[in-house]
Amino acid sequence: MARRYTRVITSPAAARIPREWNRPFVSLLSDWGVRDPSPAICRGVVLSIAPDALIVDISHEVDKFNIRHGALLLWCALPFLPIGAHVAVVDPGVGSSRRPIAIETARGDYLVGPDNGLLLPGAERLGGIERVHAIENTQYLLPVLSSTFHGRDLFTPAGAHLALGVPLEYIGPPVDPAGLATLDWPQVGVRPGELETAVIYRDTFGNLKLAGLIADLHEALGGIERGEELAVRVGGGGRRRTERVRWASTFSDVAVGECLLYEDSYGRLCLARNQGSAAAALRLDEGTPLTITRPATRLAAGSAAKATDEETQPSVAARPAD
């Protein structure tokens, strides 16, 4: 099955942002947290290079070392940000042989970070990869490169220079996009009557974002009615269990405490619980594979109706053999 991160979605907000931004724009994302000074230090590095830069912190609370989590937050945020340089650092391999890279996207942004798959969904979200260059030219880095803080010494200064208009090819040599490290991103299986997916992120409310978009669900199940009951099958073999949820457009479509499946504000499928935690109620967490179908009772009823219908119709199969 082909790996697929997303379909490209262009947000109305992004469409209204002028391509020629009148200030350098830099966004920052990391798993550093905010207790230590790392985020402030990197903001300072940007301002030392581009004093007029507008800086936005996407998040510094990415789960520690969780590349998939960081990639998802980039995927969600980037279409709503101005065109600029987006520095992302979730880098368990810092100081190793992994490459530092800068990606130019079709929208005109630069994504700067480690070559570990972190940047790929965001790049696809912005129209796809145009060019990739390794970050090697020390002229655009801090004078001393530590072995454990490439966010400060390498990624942030490179991003700031790109935001100022330094050509990408000045940063370092080109890299074949086909050779980039891929992301361990759950694949979506679409078959008649069922959608195979997995939990990719649990938010602070206990909502569970799934691999796959609303179009995948429609392709698998056909038309879905608001309020329709769906079955969520978890596990396999003797440990398999099935949970029931409602297809809804908002939390109040179901009773307090009831679980629902809905399309979230980013176009992703999401399991939630009205005024509660879907993760706790459904006993699911990140990485859990699951299958979404219609309940067996409805399928059985539909099959019975079809059989009754067929009994009333002439059947060519009933023709006597020659």
At which residue positions do the language-model features occur?
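N-terminal glycine-/serine-/threonine-rich phosphate-binding loop
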Residues: A2-S97
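Structural motif
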Residues: P24-S27, A53-V56, G84-V87, P100-A102, ...
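Conserved active-site and cofactor/substrate-binding residues in soluble primary-metabolism enzymes
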Residues: P37, I41, A50, F65, ...
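Active-site histidine-anchored catalytic micro-motif
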Residues: I49-I55, H69-G70, F80-V90, G95-D153
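Anionic-ligand-binding alpha/beta catalytic cores of soluble enzymes and soluble regulatory domains
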Residues: L142-E225
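Flexible, glycine/charged-enriched surface loops at secondary-structure junctions
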Residues: L168-P174, R241-R244, A300-A301
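A conserved acidic, glycine/proline-rich C-terminal tail/linker
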Residues: A211-R283
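Generic C-terminus detector
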Residues: G267-D322
